[in-house]
């Protein structure tokens, strides 16, 4: 089932310098909660600056859903230290509030009023809140409070120069983009390994079912927690943040122009379902438009091709201008065993897996074939730790034991690890392989198995509160290591000033401005 990458690995052994200079960044979402674990109803703390313009600390869907962003970094330890510093600073700024340490929230009732993230009075600020209003009206607010970690990754130019004989990023943008699309197709085929190893949402609170019947064979605890005994990441299931209405958009990952055309089509295609919601009610906008996607970011995907946008530029126009600059991996649950929701093991594994995905052959895939890859993901998401679980290739029936496929994959990853360890010195990448491959012999070592044991004993709420309290104490007491309090003070003031400048520069009424965004 695993493609033969022996030639590519031999090439890598001869060109180790091609992996010198991998760059990466992290984004982590977390809900602000009260000491009792309930969603905080306070506004975004002014001491954390303006969510619209802050470099490191912003908000996602809800006013209480924090998002932390590290700058692009070539050094794993430094990147994780910066992320921890952001957490340390925030923990001190939140007073009694805590950061929820799980992907799935718990103490949110059906129909509870969840305040949308607020970004001030500028047109762009109001637009961002309106987009979130559209998400709430389309999919329900509860689904939007699920948290995850995003890992951004780019291969060095030296890799593409050696692999595709490109001269520079500009003239080589088609070849580099084709290489990243190969990586993405392999991710769709084999990325289920991420929830298998690191999924940490095997259970949900009953409020997540919103009273709707489900075909999933949930077991229920006395405290009202629903769980699947072999599940890994219900966050990635249809109960979590996926969008079924997008499954037939026909977007493919074979080439830049085809991908962008599919994305632009979805933004322009009207939706009968969303038209029924209406655009306005009592003079207030309900959504940006009534199309299948309000904006490109609404496309649900476990991985995205990306390029840093210029002012006023859409993500797809940025891709057309300069090609793919990096990819964003979106399938990581919050790691409940880390105070910052992610750890070094995961980052090193993702480095290895991304390189493998870039090396392995990946035939082009139709949109139907892309949908078929979802079958393996769903198996792993819902019953990944089930003894004897099998996986399929493409649209064929499942016939390959997950345990064997996982071990075959790690045999390749270990060779990539030897190359990366050779560049950096030490054995860290190989040690990560040794630790993680054991999860295929013993699924009880996976994050989902470990956290489920605690959840069955203490409930989701009890587990979340216990970890939130522990991490709050730990982070508040730790000194900053990479950043300084002065850095945070300066960025807080600068972000508020930037927001005021944006608001002062706006002269156009919002309705007129919004009409031009279509």
Swiss-Prot record:
It comes from the Bacteria. Keywords: ATP-binding, Glutathione biosynthesis, Ligase, Nucleotide-binding. Pathway: Sulfur metabolism; glutathione biosynthesis; glutathione from L-cysteine and L-glutamate: step 1/2. Coiled coil: none annotated. One of its GO terms (biological process) is glutathione biosynthetic process. It holds the Pfam family Glu_cys_ligase. One of its GO terms (cellular component) is cytosol. It is an enzyme of class 6 (ligase). InterPro entries: Gln_synth/guanido_kin_cat_dom, Glu_cys_ligase, Glut_cys_ligase. This is Glutamate--cysteine ligase.
